[in-house]
Amino acid sequence: MSRPTGACPHAWRHQQQPLRGRMWAASPAFRRQLVLLRSLLPSPPAPSSVAGFPPSCPSCSSFLRVRTNHAMAASAGTVYEADAEAVVRRITPPLDRARHKGQAGKIAVIGGCREYTGAPYFAAISALKVGADLSHVFCTKDAATVIKSYSPELIVHPILEESYSVRDDERASVSSKILTEVGKWMERFDCIVVGPGLGRDSFLLDCVSNIMRHARQANIPTVVDGDGLFLVTNNLSLVEGNPLAILTPNVYEYKRLVQKVLNCDVDEETASEQLITLCQKIGDVTIMQKGKADVISDGKTVTQVSTFGSPRRCGGQGDILSGSVAVFASWARHFVLTNEQPTEKRKAASHAFEKNKRSTVTSDIIEFLGKSLEDICPAEH
């Protein structure tokens, strides 16, 4: 059935979306990450010129108004809560039987060593739970078997090496071989996550630095978390001037970034202005400062997500976030390329805590990731 001229192509969703779904949309479950996605979008044109989305549709054009308001007040350091519903509906790909494997996203996690095997698993499996079709992990040989045993859904590559397993006279050749092996896959990925379970071995970090440079040359969005932030803090050129780089520091990682880049301590009195300055100083990156309230900026605007998640601060929740952000970043970029671009993790954490209370662990939160997206974009539609 053809729709009337000027009608919103998503009108059926607006009409059928129950109140409960709208409550999910307004929740932190999507606001937290979708602010990051909006940062990846180019500045929007006037509503009347957005292809397929007439200005008469308030839901589909609301993110345009939000961006305009942000731009007007950015200089004043105003902090906004994100409007996620319109954005998530626009970027989430439909579950179409005509689509083939991989079209909903191919994500790669770069991390995993002898000491840390859980973090890369959490990031990679979260990407699948949110909706990516394929999730890869590039890790050391010591970590590969362990990570493979966690889940048969993950594609695990035992490619990375640590210093103890490489002779000094072999470092150059081994590093080149690692980059070549990862490079064979790079063009297939929609986004990579660097850092979960990476560790701080000097040779391994050098190899990952080369991988990040290769990803940048290939224009692959890169989410940097965990020890990837340690690497970037000590080598800012890896992300300087890269609008496809998303940094997700916790309070300690953010403090180190501020001290390194701005040569000062974190100032709570001017937190939003300092975050904007940090993004601008690094150049074009998006930063999500995790904490009691998550604060997100692309160097132009600042958005805060303060809705309650879970009081349980078990390890691994940041890894869930990085894997989820990678999926949304890939969907947003695909939307931009074919049409003209956080909250989910907090909502999932809240539901997991309601069910498990003090025994809540990271795998319980992962269980609710799919539900968070389903309430916004039902699979049957």
Swiss-Prot record:
GO terms for biological process?
A: metabolite repair; nicotinamide nucleotide metabolic process
UniProt superkingdom: Eukaryota
Q: Which GO terms describe its molecular function?
A: ATP binding; ATP-dependent NAD(P)H-hydrate dehydratase activity
- Does the record carry Glycoprotein as a key word? no
Q: Which reaction does it catalyse?
A: (6S)-NADHX + ATP = ADP + phosphate + NADH + H(+); (6S)-NADPHX + ATP = ADP + phosphate + NADPH + H(+)
Q: Which amino acids does the record list as binding (6S)-NADPHX? A: G197, N250, V251, Y252, E253, Y254, K255, R256, D319
Q: Member of which family?
A: Belongs to the NnrD/CARKD family.
What exactly does this protein do?
Catalyzes the dehydration of the S-form of NAD(P)HX at the expense of ATP, which is converted to ADP. Together with NAD(P)HX epimerase, which catalyzes the epimerization of the S- and R-forms, the enzyme allows the repair of both epimers of NAD(P)HX, a damaged form of NAD(P)H that is a result of enzymatic or heat-dependent hydration.
PROSITE patterns assigned to the protein according to its UniProt record, in alphabetical order: YJEF_C_3 (PS51383)
Q: For this protein, what is the EC number? A: 4.2.1.93
Q: What is this protein called?
A: ATP-dependent (S)-NAD(P)H-hydrate dehydratase
Question: Which keywords has UniProt assigned to this entry?
Answer: ATP-binding, Lyase, NAD, NADP, Nucleotide-binding, Phosphoprotein
Family annotation (SUPFAM superfamilies) = Ribokinase-like (SSF53613)
For whether the record's keyword set contains Nucleotide-binding, the answer is: yes
> What are the binding positions for ATP in this chain?
290-294, 309-318
Which ranges carry the YjeF C-terminal domain? 84-376
Instruction: Name its co-factor(s).
Output: Mg(2+)
Give the matching Pfam families: Carb_kinase (PF01256)
